[in-house]
Design a protein with these regions (language model features):
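Bacterial N-terminal signal peptides
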Residues: 17-28
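Metalloprotease/metallohydrolase-associated module, dominated by Zn2+-dependent proteases
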Residues: 210-257, 273-338
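Structural recognition of the beta-strand scaffold that forms the well-ordered cores
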Residues: 66-71, 100-101, 106, 113, ...
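Extracellular/lumenal mature domains of secreted and surface-exposed proteins
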Residues: 324-420
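Bacterial N-terminal signal peptides that target proteins for export
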Residues: 4-18
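N-terminal carbohydrate-binding/catalytic regions of secreted carbohydrate-active enzymes
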Residues: 38-149, 159
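Active-site-proximal segments of metallohydrolase catalytic domains
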Residues: 118-223
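C-terminal region of N-terminal signal peptides and the immediate post-cleavage residues
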Residues: 26-43
Length: 420
């Protein structure tokens, strides 16, 4: 769910400790063993849902993104055991499996933006940059009284406004000199007993989240401005297992399973509609909204719950994502994908002399592809078989080839090269 509004910033507060994570280096945590998607599950007929396709509205999409998790938990509050680790494992796994088509993030690659008349498809390219545990007290409630005075709201001890959430994100960014720009997304998680209002003037039936009814919304994504730059942020209140936001399954055996489903909903929407000017349908529904609580086929189950996605070897129960190409909600991209390889000659290149790169690409029914080569000296090429001259020696550099078909499906090939 996107939120197309701005809010007034308030005074800043200090941020908590930042734990920087190199996603590719994190070992998988101990836990259940998960099977891979079966052929039947992978190639099952997509389930159609009502409504029109999402359409492009002229704004940017995310071709790559860096993700940060902020857990705002003052000393008098707490999260259940395993909640934070399940969330961080999810972000780590999504980053690890970048460029694959085996999970729902591969569905996003059919969408694109247009700059100066050039269409550029999304690449499933995510980096998990770190976790911030913020422990400063919550501010006094700025929400309408009925949120805390209602029967359901009596379980709430505080209600955070969107302006207060924005202030916290700015504080964390400033306190740790973190990056800005729409390629950076900050997910804010709050503990049990914390309500939230995303609109400046909510009504009793719309605009607020409370820990029991969880009505109005389960989470939202939006953007703010700090230091003259836009930043994406997502608000994810704690999901009670008795509330309507609960996903219904817990394959990892803790309450973090449900909020991970909600995070995936918002993350996919942020990729395709970061500023509210990207992809959504005639009713304003984004690719996650159109498939809310539509989960599709399970792959298998652990002793504590079913899972329908295996990402970096871990199982998750995640809602499906809308695919224009399939005209349905789907769990993963099941259409034909390009396969690619390349070689270079001479096999022992010398700097100052020409190196020829030759690629081979195939995909059933497709003959037109786009190519993007990146070389370890910073060079780039966009033809099928480029030549490149390395001005200096290179010790174990990386050459990357990304091949895209007309539908946004991609093949990625990486090879090392040493230039003497």
């Amino acid at each position: 769910m996107a939120s197309r509004f701005s809010a007034v910033a308030r005074r800043s507060r200090s941020a908590g400790a930042l734990v920087v994570i190199a996603a590719a280096l994190i070992a998988a945590s101990a836990g259940p063993t998960y099977g891979s998607p079966s052929a039947a599950a992978t190639h099952a007929q997509p389930r159609a849902t009502a409504g029109s396709d999402v359409t492009y509205h002229g704004g940017p999409v995310l071709h790559s993104s860096g993700v940060f998790a902020i857990f705002w938990v003052p000393p008098s509050y707490s999260l259940p055991n395993g909640y934070q680790s399940t969330v961080t494992q999810y972000f780590t796994d999504v980053a690890h499996d970048s460029f694959l088509t085996s999970n729902e993030f591969g569905v996003d690659t059919q969408y694109y933006d247009v700059t100066k008349g050039v269409k550029k498809f999304i690449s499933y390219s995510v980096v998990y940059r770190g976790t911030n545990v913020a422990t400063q007290p919550f501010p006094a409630s700025g929400c309408p009284n009925y949120v805390l005075d209602s029967k359901a709201g009596k379980k709430s001890s505080v209600c955070l406004t969107d302006a207060e959430i924005q202030e916290e994100v700015r504080s964390v960014i400033a306190g740790h000199s973190l990056p800005t720009g729409i390629g950076n997304e900050y997910f804010v998680f709050t503990p049990p007993g914390v309500a939230n209002c995303k609109t400046a003037k909510p009504t009793k039936s719309r605009g607020c989240f409370d820990p029991i009814q969880q009505d109005g919304y389960c989470a939202y994504h939006s953007h703010l401005t700090t230091g003259g730059h836009a930043v994406l942020y997502d608000v994810l209140p704690y999901e009670d297992s008795t509330g309507v936001c609960w996903s219904g399954q817990s394959p990892n055996g803790n309450p973090g399973d449900s909020v991970v489903n909600t995070a995936s909903h918002e993350q996919n929407e942020s990729i395709t509609d970061p500023l509210g000017t990207g992809w959504y349908d005639d009713s304003g529904n984004e690719i996650g909204d159109k498939c809310h609580l539509t989960f599709g086929a399970k792959i298998s189950a652990t002793s504590t719950g079913m899972y329908n996605e295996v990402i970096n070897g871990h199982g998750y129960w995640l809602q499906e994502i809308w695919s224009n190409r399939a005209q349905a909600c789907v769990q993963r991209n099941t259409f034909p994908q390009p396969t690619a390889s390349f070689a270079f000659t001479p096999t022992s290149p010398v700097h100052g002399k020409k190196v020829t790169f030759a690629s081979s690409v195939s995909e059933p029914g497709e003959k037109t592809f786009k190519y993007r080569w990146t070389f370890p000296d910073g060079g780039v090429a966009t033809v099928k078989n480029p030549t490149h001259n390395f001005a200096k020696p290179v010790f174990v550099g990386i050459v990357t080839l990304i091949v895209s078909d007309p539908h946004g499906n991609q093949a990625r090939v990486v090879k090392s090269i040493t230039v003497t």
